[in-house]
Amino acid sequence: MTNYNVFNQSNRPLFTQLTNTFSAPGIEASPDSGAAAAGSFFALTTNNTSIPSNQNLLLQILNAAGSGRTIRISSLTGGTTAAATLVIYSGGTVTVGSTPVPVNTLLGNTNASVVTTRQNTGTLGGTFTSIASIPLTAGIFSLDLNGSIIVPPGQTLSISVGTGNQTAAINLFWWEF
């Protein structure tokens, strides 16, 4: 890097050094933005789902042991029509009701996510550990996790919203590398 003379001489104009110019911008972007531009950022939604009495809306992603990629959870959003509890779990078992397909947020990109997905209403089974439990009021929710929850190969992340007699949605966003 060039060392610039920081002292002005009386016969010259005031010294300036332009930074963040159009030809050399100094712009910072989030990891989400970089992952999206690289075709490695994904979205998964349950859409609006009616939850029967005494059940939960469940969404799960499984990162297979041999996938070769690590999942970093960017954010978790959604909504509910009544008071509920949002719980994020490590592990657990969701009986397959449907297998929603993750969408690459670089629209038109053919890169596919390595995760296996499961969605259903019911109760989470198997062995699991709660990471976070958040009481919700009716309305929208949004958690910016900024990659702070990591799902390495061979691990599972499960999310539940409930319990029942309401309509809810879960939207999960992550990047893979």
Question: Which stretches of residues belong to each language-model region?
Answer:
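Beta-strand-centric surfaces of beta-sandwich/beta-rich domains
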Residues: 1-15, 20, 27-177
